[in-house]
A protein has these predicted regions:
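Short beta-strand immediately N-terminal to the catalytic nucleophile in serine-hydrolase-like folds
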Residues: 40-45, 70
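Catalytic active-site module of serine/aspartate enzymes centered on a nucleophile-bearing elbow/loop
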Residues: 122-125, 130-156
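Serine-hydrolase catalytic machinery in alpha/beta-hydrolase-like enzymes
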Residues: 1-39, 125-130, 134-135
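Catalytic histidine neighborhood in serine/cysteine hydrolases
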Residues: 109-125
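Conserved alpha/beta-hydrolase "acid-adjacent" motif
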Residues: 97-102
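A conserved short beta-strand
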Residues: 62-74
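Gly/Ala-rich beta-loop-alpha elbow adjacent to hydrolase catalytic centers
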Residues: 44-53
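Short beta-strand/loop motif that positions the catalytic acidic residue
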Residues: 84, 90-92
Length: 156
């Protein structure tokens, strides 16, 4: 029912507070499970989901290894941006001019390590040949770096 209503009204996809609360609830569930409680969490959000990921990261900073925003709307995270404590990767299509501008502005509000990676020739959904693969490679490399940095030296 909720999904059907959202198809018509789009009310939930832009309710960043609701989406953020859902992510926080999922992180709490992971923290309560013996098999997942000690695993690092990477929050990956696309479009409005990126804003929700940033809000959740700001609310539970001790639980988030990194945040990845793919074609995201981090501007919708509002006052949560300066409270984010995990490193952030922004991946934006080079032809997605407005979203690129919004990501540049959001990056300036962060007080943590971050990178803005522009994928040349890509539009908002990265539908052009090879662009989604470039996103995947970029995200993999970023997450591997974060995992290595977080691992105790004797495990590396």
């Amino acid at each position: 029912e909720e999904e059907q209503r959202d198809l018509v009204t789009r009310e939930h996809r832009f309710d960043i507070a609701l989406l953020g609360r859902r992510l926080v609830a999922a992180m709490r569930w992971l923290d309560a499970e013996p098999g997942t409680r000690d695993l690092p969490i990477v929050l990956f959000g696309a479009s409005t989901g990126a804003a929700a990921a940033l809000r959740a990261a700001a609310e539970r900073p001790e639980h988030v290894l990194t945040v990845v925003s793919r074609g995201g709307r981090p501007d919708l995270a509002g006052d949560a941006l300066p409270a984010v404590r995990a490193p952030v990767l922004f991946v934006v299509g080079g032809q997605d001019h407005e979203v690129l501008r919004l990501n540049e502005e959001a990056a300036r509000q962060l007080r943590v390590p971050h990178r803005l990676q522009v994928i040349p020739g890509a539009t908002h959904l990265f539908e052009e040949p090879g662009t989604l693969e470039r996103v995947a490679d970029t995200v993999r490399d970023w997450c591997e770096q974060r995992l290595r940095a977080a691992s105790p030296q004797d495990e590396q």
